[in-house]
């Protein structure tokens, strides 16, 4: 990779970000396509988000991804947000078009494409979603679009779960309930169980958002976390013979849409998966 005075700079803002595979994905793809770009990470504490976004804009950063905990709050500091991202209430990709910061959400389609790669048909099924933040909003939208019968949103902060459940009910005219994380234990039947929280990510690798007993009830378990590749949540699934997947395919698929927004080209997903396997 050659960096010169015309190199376009892209990046990721979040807190933490040192676990991220996004630099590997984008930098290897820039190189493969002979695109003069570089992708770096910026660890931005919540109280510094506004200043960080202003700084990225002032420096002419061409685009950036947004990860936890900024997917919702970053919307306050953008010049434009797409209708879909506005509806979802979360942005994960920003394009700088001549000083105008435009926010997009590629998580929804990234998750849908991930389900297709996994050959997991969710139509008519019941889903439990752990967490009610920006990632959860995208997952709930994706599940609703793909035709699940119902969604239960479980979150430590009940009012966030309630607000999201009410919004999904209204937007999609479907059954969507909410409960606390602890109350998930009381459900006897859990078909699809999805973790959108950061519990299990470094440095909380010894924790799971729910108990092994809850995971064992599920038919399919999905963890948006991809590093570590097998969280305790997913270890519970493997131990109990439950089909499961981590968030790697969602990461790659949403990244391919972000890459397209920045460059006008999709990257080679097979090449990217090969690169990741080489690193992990």
From Swiss-Prot:
GO terms for biological process: amino acid biosynthetic process; aromatic amino acid family biosynthetic process; chorismate biosynthetic process; shikimate metabolic process. Pfam families: SDH_C, Shikimate_DH, Shikimate_dh_N. Its EC number is 1.1.1.25. It comes from Caldanaerobacter subterraneus subsp. tengcongensis (strain DSM 15242 / JCM 11007 / NBRC 100824 / MB4). Belongs to the shikimate dehydrogenase family. Keywords: Amino-acid biosynthesis, Aromatic amino acid biosynthesis, NADP, Oxidoreductase. Shikimate binds at residues 20-22, 67, 92, 107, 226. Involved in the biosynthesis of the chorismate, which leads to the biosynthesis of aromatic amino acids. Catalyzes the reversible NADPH linked reduction of 3-dehydroshikimate (DHSA) to yield shikimate (SA). This is Shikimate dehydrogenase (NADP(+)). It catalyses: shikimate + NADP(+) = 3-dehydroshikimate + NADPH + H(+). InterPro entries: Aminoacid_DH-like_N_sf, NAD(P)-bd_dom_sf, SDH_C, Shikimate_DH, Shikimate_DH-bd_N, Shikimate_DH_fam, Shikm_DH/Glu-tRNA_Rdtase. The keyword Transport does not apply. Gene3D superfamilies: Leucine Dehydrogenase, chain A, domain 1 (3.40.50.10860), NAD(P)-binding Rossmann-like Domain (3.40.50.720). NADP(+) binds at residues 83, 131-135, 155-160, 224, 247. Homodimer. It is an enzyme of class 1 (oxidoreductase). GO terms for molecular function: NADP binding; shikimate 3-dehydrogenase (NADP+) activity. NCBIfam families: aroE, PRK00258.2-2, PRK00258.3-3. Pathway: Metabolic intermediate biosynthesis; chorismate biosynthesis; chorismate from D-erythrose 4-phosphate and phosphoenolpyruvate: step 4/7. The active site is at residue 71.
